[in-house]
Amino acid sequence: MGHSAAGKYIDQHIMLRKNPSTLIIDSRDRTGPLSYDNFSVTVSPAIAGATKVRLLFASIGVPLASNEPYYLIRCPQLGIGVRSAAGSSGTTFIIPVNSQPGYRSLFGSQNEFLYSANLQQPADDISRLDFQILKYGGAAAGMTENSYYVIELSYDD
């Protein structure tokens, strides 16, 4: 991935950080079995009163033979689900496919896709967060090692 010096610095140093009321989660900080579709983050001390979750950045590599219109991010502990035929199953972060071959878009204010959500019921006592990227329809996405995303979680401290 071609990065500017500033972009490279941000990519390497965003990592998992805890501020008084914000947790920055980078999918490259995986714990548990290595998988590019799934990852878990252990949070210590546990977070109480999570109120908002926001997708700050997504850079998703293209699996071979992919013709998916978008990918979905799921995190059950935060109520971030995947839309189903029966209707919505909670908040869904959508990573759309850009019109350029081999490129996934960043989120921006002009983007109609959801990238920030207030949690309906504040999540309490979070000590582990499990994230998963799925294809349209719910199958495993088959992400590559160059795929990652950064999520910001706000909570009452």
Q: What residue ranges belong to the model's regions?
A:
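The ATP-binding site of the protein kinase catalytic domain
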Residues: 1-157
